[in-house]
């Protein structure tokens, strides 16, 4: 039961940190490449 409580308290914190990091990454990509439908470093 204690392991379940630990899991339930860790999962929201981990998912919040993950979504904050993902949002920051998307914001920085959009800041560096505004309105990019194709990214220059993917096209060869």
Swiss-Prot record:
The chain crosses the membrane at residues 7-27. Its main location: plastid. Keywords: Chloroplast, Membrane, Photosynthesis, Photosystem I, Plastid, Thylakoid, Transmembrane, Transmembrane helix. Pfam families: PSI_PsaJ (PF01701). One of its GO terms (cellular component) is photosystem I. It is a single-pass membrane protein. One of its GO terms (biological process) is photosynthesis. Belongs to the PsaJ family. This is Photosystem I reaction center subunit IX. It comes from Cicer arietinum (Chickpea).
